[in-house]
Amino acid sequence: MQLIYQCAWIVPLCPLISSILIGLGLLFFEKSTKSIRRICAISCILSLSVATVICYNLSYEQIIDNSIYQYSWSWISNGDIVLEFGYLIDPLTCIMLVLVTSVAIIVMIYSDGYMSHDEGYVRFFVYLSLFTASMLGLVLSPNLIQIYIFWELVGMCSYLLIGFWFTRPSAANACQKAFITNRIGDFGLLLGILGFYWITGSFEFENLFKGFKDLLINNEVSPFFAILCASFLFLGPVAKSAQFPLHVWLPDAMEGPTPISALIHAATMVAAGIYLVARMFPLFETLPFVMSVISWTGAVTALLGATLAFFQKDLKRGLAYSTMSQLGYMMLALGIGSYRAGLFHLITHAYSKALLFLGSGSVIHSMEPIVGYRPDESQNMIFMGGLRKHMPITGTTFLLGTLSLCGIPPFACFWSKDEIIADSWLYSPFIGWIALLTAGLTSFYMFRIYFLTFEGEFRANSFKENTPVSSVSLWGEFRFEEFGEKKADSVLQIVEKSSPKEFFRFVQSNRESSETQIGNYLSAYPSKEPIHFLYPKESDYTMLIPLLILSIPTLLIGFIGAPLPNGQLGSDLLSHWLNSFGNLSPERLSENWLEFIEDAITSISIASFGIFSAFILYGPASIFPRDLEKKIEPQLKGVWGFFINYMYNWSQYRGYIDQYYNKIFVEGTRILAYASSFFDRWIIDGIVNGTGISSFSGGEGMRYGEGGRVSSYLFGLVFGMTILLAVILLII
């Protein structure tokens, strides 16, 4: 047992070494390194495999004996200041190690197929290995200083990966946005770390928690200052885990390659914030006000993310907002004291969301040769539809991930999400309603994504550049009236202008076969040149095998925390594992199996309603009458129509939050810079330059006055005496 614990330092070292060696080869021997790029990828995968084996052995030992192991050695020692470097092995560490390594190795295998035609193939694996090593170092850290170091490395790697295609302006802007937004959180995190060091005199977790609790009980620390430091510390997870109001970087992060989107949004960067809150949970739970802030931040983020995902047209962006919403669930659970439920949802969501993102990557990879390689084309769900026929494995695995995220039993997320909703009701009815409403919205937008992507008929062939819009009846009479016989230079010009009503018409009309519509068009507009229609095809095995592997935990991983039918909850494997960590709150757990069934019925009902609503609006055509649109047309008017349009604009414009930030911070900073420039140029420089100009002018005047002419002196004397007499007379 001791041997495997002593080998824990190898875990982050394995991917770090492969990243450094391949990176140096790419830097100094670029052509030679690129010529053996497949060997480089295999070496990255093998090095991470070694780390994965060690992590699983560590977890096995933890499950058996529930012991906590910490090893540290002195790094800096200068009087009272002692900084140590080492690693900590406890249940939380093992959970995160297994999560990060298992998802990362699957993403690496998947990336071999997805990035095979990219010139930056080797560079991508270098960044990916460094990213994984940074996250593994973060979760092994036994103190706040070491966490902060790896925290910054994770942020740097995310900057490199989001901006991987840096020649694309949108990607360059996205990585800068992510970096700057996270700077705000990192600054708060640093202030919080320094504040707690000032209070307790230690960076080590055990000493920090014990010392702070004793000081708080003995009233030796100001509660206000403690709350301030904890709030600053919480600012780091708010930015890193995309919590409101520092969530704005997350959808733009979709500019990076899809495999890294899966890793960032499943097990690494966004999970780092949740991990830090869980790690600092013994400290936060002593401050009820901070716990309330955490819970409400999570609740607002969960609901906001769900509403922003409501009418997204971009496949990856819809999944990004889904991630934001689910991270809100986790933060909410930790804030209400449901430590186990928060970690449980972190585990189940990681595998389900990784499956969904890799599935979306398979779709995008197949769509690019047909519609183009721009993200607003290959990721646009308007061009998709019917992909399950052409990509059955991708479609089936994507459906499994969707069912899991919606909370449908027996899939993984059902068990964790249901527990969060139940515990939310015990904490506060308001938060309970938010959690329940978010569950319904999640089911709606996730199945909206699934239906638009995989069901119906393939729609990309219905759009041909420079084709009269009226020739293919996809937009209804309204579109014909608006565009007439004008030709569309780009389909995207039409797509971006579409309203919710027109988009609904588009989906309804596409329940008929696209081939039939195009056949009618060809009959009406014969052409001498034959038109060939392309269809997506299933991805190769290097991309399909990871999807099939991730389907297994998506279906089964939830059972590690599922309640056993013995009349009591908390007797499952996850609870047994976490009991040694001492952070469970049994009073917040449901009491028995029957109560769990009652709560489950409620959550399943609201999820089913969301699925049914999505099915009505976006589902397959076979069970719907063709005049369904006319039947619901009156319902789209009035207050309901206003609500739909408002939600559409709310979703498309990201809740107007980016616009507010642009007005307040960007334009405000520009105005402040202009005012500063004006003050510097005309006031500061004016005083300096004015002094010189005044001296020069005075000197010139005196030079001309001292010309040596008696008449000038006499005139000056008379003029001066006249002025003096006038002043005296005025005074008298």
UniProtKB/Swiss-Prot annotation:
NDH shuttles electrons from NAD(P)H:plastoquinone, via FMN and iron-sulfur (Fe-S) centers, to quinones in the photosynthetic chain and possibly in a chloroplast respiratory chain. The immediate electron acceptor for the enzyme in this species is believed to be plastoquinone. Couples the redox reaction to proton translocation, and thus conserves the redox energy in a proton gradient. Keywords: Chloroplast, Membrane, NAD, NADP, Plastid, Plastoquinone, Quinone, Thylakoid, Translocase, Transmembrane, Transmembrane helix, Transport. It holds the Pfam family Proton_antipo_C. It comes from the Eukaryota. It comes from Anthoceros angustus. NCBIfam families: NDH_I_L, PRK06590.1. One of its GO terms (molecular function) is quinone binding. GO terms for cellular component: chloroplast thylakoid membrane. GO terms for biological process: ATP synthesis coupled electron transport; electron transport coupled proton transport. This is NAD(P)H-quinone oxidoreductase subunit 5, chloroplastic. Gene3D superfamilies: 1.20.5.2700. InterPro entries: NADH_UbQ_OxRdtase_chlpt_su5_C (IPR002128), NADHpl_OxRdtase_5_subgr (IPR018393), ND/Mrp_TM (IPR001750), NU5C-like (IPR003945), Proton_antipo_N (IPR001516). Belongs to the complex I subunit 5 family. NDH is composed of at least 16 different subunits, 5 of which are encoded in the nucleus. It is found in: Plastid, Chloroplast thylakoid membrane. It catalyses: a plastoquinone + NADH + (n+1) H(+)(in) = a plastoquinol + NAD(+) + n H(+)(out); a plastoquinone + NADPH + (n+1) H(+)(in) = a plastoquinol + NADP(+) + n H(+)(out). It is an enzyme of class 7 (translocase). Its EC number is 7.1.1.-. The chain crosses the membrane at residues 9-29, 39-59, 89-109, 125-145, 147-167, 184-204, 215-235, 258-278, 291-311, 327-347, 353-373, 395-415, 420-440, 544-564, 604-624, 712-732. It is a multi-pass membrane protein.
